[in-house]
Amino acid sequence: MKRSPEMTTLLKIALSAAAVAALSIAQASDAGAQAAQSYEAPPKEANAIFANYRFRNGETLPELGLNYTTLGQPRRNSHGAIDNAVLMLHWTSASGQALLTPEFRTALFAPGAPFDVTRYFVILPDAIGHGRSSKPSDGLRAAFPRYGYGDMVDLQHKLVTEVLGITRLRAIVGISMGCMNAWQWAEAYPDAMDGIMPIACFPSPITGRNLLWRRMVVDAIKSDPAWAGGNYKQQPPSATNGLAIVRLMIDGVPRLQEAAATTESADAFVRSVREQAVRVDANDVIYALEASRDFDTRPGLSRVKAKVLAVNFADDEFYRDSLQTLQHDIRIVPGARFVVRDVSDGSAGHLSMTRPALWADQARDFLAWLAEKP
């Protein structure tokens, strides 16, 4: 069959279009494969060492280790600066590993999730005194420097800027203790981030129920003869007993009603809590609980430059919404927003913070807000 010039031209166009389409499909497939590979890649863990580190109170450590984990890859803009870094900060007596559970990875880090690690470079440090970072139980015990929350933030800042070479974070997300650290970041390093998302705290000092349980646990441990001034040979029983009682205060009333519906289930709950508590070190607990003594960001709230979306929970007995403390304090912060989540299926009081599916929508809204043009 003889083709006309017009038919030949049309055939070439069709073949060209098919080739482009095939290439586009292949590229999309490659991009999808790369994204899946990035998400499925194991977290990278490292330990930053700071020699002769001086704490805010003047005490020093010859060598301080700050452990951290990263997810995803750093992305550089046209100026060569990393522009997709998100710092996520854990709660008291936890570590960055607590944010790597399947629940967190699915709700926050999976493809299409708010902090999709195919798009963001996520940094999960172990705060000083926690996880695999330097802490009293490493050997110094009660001779370990008395760190505060301010020291935690200073070390996180050194990690981000000096070790990872990041001049500005896209966001900081902090949970409970990490929530307070996020407020401190915004106050101490106002140009270091685009926004912060503090979850489950107030920007004002710890008071009331939250302060009392800390003092009660510390007092119980220090009053125990087995504590021996911090030089114990076996963990003081008071540490386990004290931390077991804390669960009554931080868990949600509806959840406890369900978990302790019978004597048998209540006993099982107590055994479970005790089994978790025996894995902690008494000195580490004391240091972690007393570290909050220097927390008060109220004096600098009016100077915060970052966008702020604070998230609290209506059934959190540590940070009672009826006190209206968050509403009062956040008015001082320029342009800040807040959400107090109502009680819903899955709510767990203060521990709602550990259920990211409950606040993933707020995280998505927060990132959309950061993306808005000024």
Question: Which stretches of residues belong to each language-model region?
Answer:
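Alpha/beta-hydrolase
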Residues: S38-E40, E45, M216-F318
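Flexible "cap/lid" loop of the alpha/beta hydrolase fold
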Residues: M197-A228
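Catalytic-loop region of hydrolases
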Residues: A31-L87, G96-A98, P102, P374
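Conserved hydrolase catalytic core segment
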Residues: R168-T207
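Conserved loop-alpha-helix segment in the C-terminal half of the alpha/beta-hydrolase fold
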Residues: L309, A314-R337
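Conserved acidic catalytic loop of the alpha/beta-hydrolase fold
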Residues: G150-R170
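N-terminal cap/lid subdomain of alpha/beta-hydrolase-fold enzymes
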Residues: T69-D138
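Catalytic active-site module of serine/aspartate enzymes centered on a nucleophile-bearing elbow/loop
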Residues: A336-P374
